[in-house]
Curated annotation (Swiss-Prot):
GO biological process, one term: response to endoplasmic reticulum stress
Protein's job: Epithelial ion channel that plays an important role in the regulation of epithelial ion and water transport and fluid homeostasis. Mediates the transport of chloride ions across the cell membrane. Possesses an intrinsic ATPase activity and utilizes ATP to gate its channel; the passive flow of anions through the channel is gated by cycles of ATP binding and hydrolysis by the ATP-binding domains. The ion channel is also permeable to HCO(3)(-); selectivity depends on the extracellular chloride concentration.
Modified-residue entries (Phosphothreonine), positions: 717
Stretches of the chain found on the membrane's Extracellular side: 99-122, 217-222, 320-339, 881-919, 1013-1014, 1118-1131
Molecular functions per Gene Ontology: ABC-type transporter activity; ATP binding; ATP hydrolysis activity; bicarbonate transmembrane transporter activity; chloride channel activity; chloride channel inhibitor activity; chloride transmembrane transporter activity; intracellularly ATP-gated chloride channel activity
NCBIfam families: CFTR_protein
Gene behind this protein: CFTR
Domain notes: Binds and hydrolyzes ATP via the two cytoplasmic ABC transporter nucleotide-binding domains. The two ATP-binding domains interact with each other, forming a head-to-tail dimer. Normal ATPase activity requires interaction between the two domains. The first ABC transporter nucleotide-binding domain has no ATPase activity by itself. The PDZ-binding motif mediates interactions with GOPC and with the SLC4A7, NHERF1/EBP50 complex.
Highest rank taxon of the organism: Eukaryota
Organism field: Carollia perspicillata
Post-translational modification: N-glycosylated.
GO cellular component: a single term: plasma membrane
Name the record gives this protein: Cystic fibrosis transmembrane conductance regulator
Region named Disordered R region: 654-832
Amino acid sequence: MQRSPLEKASVVSKLFFSWTRPILKKGYRQRLELSDIYQIPSADSADNLSEILEREWDRELASKKNPKLINALRRCFFWRFMFYGILLYLGEVTKAVQPLLLGRIIASYDPDNKVERSIAIYLGIGLCLLFILRTLLLHPAIFGLHHIGMQMRIAMFSLIYKKTLKLSSRVLDKISIGQLVSLLSNNLNKFDEGLALAHFVWIAPLQVTLLMGLLWELLQASAFYGLAALIVVALLQAFLGRMMMKYRDQRAGKINERLVITSEIIENIQSVKAYCWEEAMEQMIENLRKTELKLTQKAAYVRYVNSSGFFASGFFVVLFSVLPYLLNEGIILRKIFTTISFCIVLRMAVTRQFPWAVQTWYDSIGAINKIQDFLQKQEFKTLEYNLTTTEVVMENVTAFWDEGFGELFENAKQNSKNRNISNSDNSLFFSNFSLLGTPVLRDINFQIERGQLLAIAGSTGAGKTSLLMMLLGELEPSEGKIKHSGRISFCSQFSWIMPGTIKENIIFGVCYDEYRYRSVIKACQLEEDISKFAEKDNVVLGEGGLTLSGGQRARICLARAVYKDADLYLLDSPFGHLDVLTEKQIFESCVCKLMANKTRILVTSKMEHLKKADKILILHEGSSYFYGTFSELQNLRPDFHSKLMGYDSFDQFSAERRNSILTETLRRFSLEGDAAIPWNETKKQSFKQTGEFGEKRKNSILNPINSAKKFSVVQKTPLQMNGIEEDSEEPSERRLSLVPDSEQGEAILPRSNVINTGPTFQKRRRQSVLNLMTHSSVNQCQIIHQKTAPSTRKMSLAPQGDLAEMDIYSRRLSQGSGLEISEEINEEDLKECFFDDMESIPTVTTWNTYLRYVTAHKSLSFVLIWCLVLFLAEVAAFLVLLWHFKEKPPQDRGNSTGSTNSSNAFIVTNTSHFYLFYIYVGVADSLFALGFIRGLPLVHSLITVSKILHHKMLHSVLHAPMSTLNMLKAGEILNRFSKDTAILDDLLPLTIFDFIQLALIVIGAIAVVSVLQPYIFLATVPVITAFITLRAYFLPTSQQLKQLESEGRSPIFTHLVTSLRGLWTLRAFGRQPYFEALFHKALNLHTANWFLYLSTLRWFQMRIEMIFVIFFIAVTFISILTTGEGEGRVGIILTLAMNIMSTLQWAMNSSIDVDSLMRSVSRVFKFIDMPTEESKSTKLIKPSKDDKLTKVMIIENQHVKKDDLWPLGGQMTIKNLIAKYTDNGNAILENISFSISPGQRVGLLGRTGSGKSTLLSALLRLLNTEGEIQIDGVSWDSVTLQQWRKAFGVIPQKVFIFSGTFRKNLDPYEQWNDEEIWKVADEVGLRSVIEQFPGKLDFVLLDGGFVLSHGHKQLLCLARSVLSKAKILLLDEPSAHLDPITYQIIRRTLKQAFADCTVILSEHRIEAMLECQQFLVIEENKVRQYDSLQKLLSEKILFQQAMSPLDRLKLLPHRNSSRHKSQSKISALKEETEEEVQETRL
């Protein structure tokens, strides 16, 4: 960054913002880079501001029982705030004085008062000086207030972040990431945007008082009629605003539903294409969009009437002010024109400034109170340790995740017994109190000496991670003692990668030791991975390590923990993402050898690990099931294996979570997805499992919880909240374990708003910061907002301060028209936080974009022409009125009822002034009617254009090739459908309307002034030229600075989320100061862009006013010097000239707003222009109902006869297959060749990242591929994509359950009747599951099907494949995270329903390969071997090395006959699973 010219700028340069000229010049000539931005002043640095506020806040905490954050802010910023407030008031006073001088100038032209004619020139000079003074006062004041608001935001940003790093885990469990981001963005933005308006809460009343005093002198009591009219207008606007909000609130549900479906589709676009569901998904979204747009139009119409009413109110305010006076006294032009000027200022004060100021204070005080509450939350306390000890000891330790719940639970339980409270929904708190009061750990005892290895095992939710958290100090024990030596290193089971290089992630601030570093890299099997990067270990890892596989991230996290020299190493399931061979090597070389002399606590369930551990601790439901050695375990606890069954299924998380933050944040927790539910309701729907069901599932691994329970699906829809609130209803749903339910969320336990009441162990997944920390996701930074079930808040898709608002009035109006989309957090802020990226879009919107936008709908061009015609009609009507005022009618002095006093001279007779009054009312009504007719079709047409563009963009995205979509982030795509679509729906139509309205007013006013005084036209031409030139000069720099500011905002929130994800690791390593410094650096970067934008913005505003002042000086002296007799003409000219100033500024602001908003249109067009997948068929052929493809599909294939049915057998031939993710990318698979016989089952083998899943994608033509693939002799390039993909049934690794009914998820095209669907549900064992839900097939699944276990989701995918009648089945690790029972069900279904199908199976589990006849071994992106099981076992390859002797014994029956499964085994399998298939757990 460059040094700021502000440091050496003179006072004059600072006053006129001339020091910004270098950056403006550079931005106009070339694209700005980050290096071009100026450094911030030291007074604005985050370190300085946070230190000042933190000192005052600490002082407040120390001195008072009830500390107030506003007092700390007052001591920091009050005097500067008041100084700029006084400047602002003085600037506003000049606006009230100007009409007085105008009245004196008009009076000097009274033919009966020629004495004052000589002073008109001096009055004109005074009027011009007032404009100059106003400019010099207002702009520094507004800039200073914006600057103070920025400083307040920075200081509180830092304070909140520091507090976040100190919060206890108990508090983090109650706060969602959405609330935190909202606290930082939505609440704190109020200071940036609203502080300049805050002073009007006292300025506006003083202004109104002054103006009413001046109007009283002119009109006497008649002035109050005008004030009453303004108050009525303000109340009417408030009423229309409430009506508009009602429509937007109704629309919020539809928008959320659409965004949920859209986000699910974007995240699972590969599955959508594999299932050929593009058209079904498109139709589903369009149906939601249709209803949404109806409500959008209603809200837009009300908003339009509101805006039109403001523009038209000026006529009627003057009318009500002048009419009573006119009836009594007659028309006096001097008073009329003076009154008009006063009313314009009065209108702004009453209808804009004061209401906005009150709202600003209300919002700001609310935001400060929320931040104040947050800053007083409980903090994390480091566990005390003993440096003299060498052992780790726990004695009688009991712990609750909720502080003080032990005592509270005992008291409540005793009260419950005494009162005999029933277990019903009406007493939900007490019926679930066993859930709340159950300790996460109970009476834990163990002791390990230095250098020993303790293995902790147990089923999901047993308390393994909680035990490690106790050692870290994250969980405080309620009872017992903990002792350790103090130096701890920690490896979380949820891989956390901070932004930086691989080396920085491993060293993590510890002193660099080359030998130790290399040893750790080698022991963690990272040498080969690092060697593949061109930059080796200096390669930069962005956004949570998106470029790494899950296994690579896990190994880097393990290396980080091992590299630190500590006394105690806590390793929480570090091998979850690793293949069998890599896991075996790391355990031996790293855990057993490199760390042999260190004390280690390892969470694991592998039998091999337990055998080598010095001590074993098995936890069950929070209690110690066993503690001792492995030999003691075998002797004393022979049934221990039952406590571990299913552990692998649920404790290891895949790299890509189905329920990623991106999808979870947009969830609506309702049962009815098609209705917008009032926010103050709580909707419940309960259903009870039968006793028979519970008995059958009682001992199932799928359901370790006793199953005879009552479930209550709760839709919480409380009132609006704007921050972090304590939920009074929340105790009914508490989390008891840090361990999430399952990989796909929900394998065992209900989640979110599903309350599971059981006698022994219950919990729910909280969407909290704690949950964020325990959720591993590749897309960890692709967060829009985390939905909070019990709390909701307002959010706007209108960019907050993003529309290049050029003054505080028009800026507030633009925000007032923003889209209120949901009652949660500010979605727009979140989206901009995480998804704004460098765009290949011009700095200024091109004319081609405007042309494409205008021609997108044929009626829009005609509407624009219609607007122009009506404008000409309005100008003509206005000229009629002016003609009557301009020409003085004949006067009958004898019949005149008025006085001939010079100060009250009448221009017309008593008869004619009523005639003029009728003309005035008629013209005003006509202008209002014409304006209404003009604007309404325009707004309607623009919304229709938005509908068309959204449809085209959705179609383009769904049909774009994966090579194109792989280049885009999911958040970037979703931004187009959320932020940009909202701009097209709401802001752009009304901003265009405002701009057209204002531009026409300015043009009309200039035309009228030029008609009245042609000489003024000569001054108008250069002024308009100067305005256009100035705008063209400023706009490129403005847009680029806004883009840089937006990009600078992203690291702030990305760093926040990154810190929260790794908070346990940060604390364990003591890296909080380092991350605070990084956060301040990100804040300073954003501040540099924002401060420069504010400065250039004020430079532009001052130049606009300076140009206008020159224009007004010219108009004033031309009219004074050239106008003869007739005060009417001078009054009209000067009044219109004064009004042109504010209107022209507003019009210029709107023009820049339009250009800024049109960038969203450019982004939408960029997506519309994406290439589409190759397809010879333009018409979608839906799946047929029988066991074949329709004849229409095969006619297009020249290689298939019309009477043939393809595919028949499922024979596949692959020759020289090469696959790439992008057109110009490196080959992911090279020269893959093999063949599969009809009905054969092929297993894909290879270590993590070898290309197994890539091969399955290539077979579906989801990647850029070269080579040849044939199915039954038909080549893949001779059929359409739809034909080809329908030949496959798919069970993807990433399970796709979209928000919709069971029926929609199974049959989105509605091709099958209920009988056929139930038949398939029976085959896969889903009938009993579906029947447990109200509505059965019509039950709406939300949140990725959170009420289903991961196993049931797999069965749902299996049912889709059965319905598709596919001849080839592709399975990508279908057994991952499955319990044994569900896995056996899937195996049975595959054997029965797909007995004659070709199956290609990718698996890590050895036992999952028992049914395969051939195996394809992939190494280094190539085929290593393609052979039968016998040959694979007889040769020394990785497959054999990865197997334990036990695995080999399992495969012995298959060495002699790999084609046929032993009938005895089949019979045993049937007997084992028959009962489980019939009844499966809900």
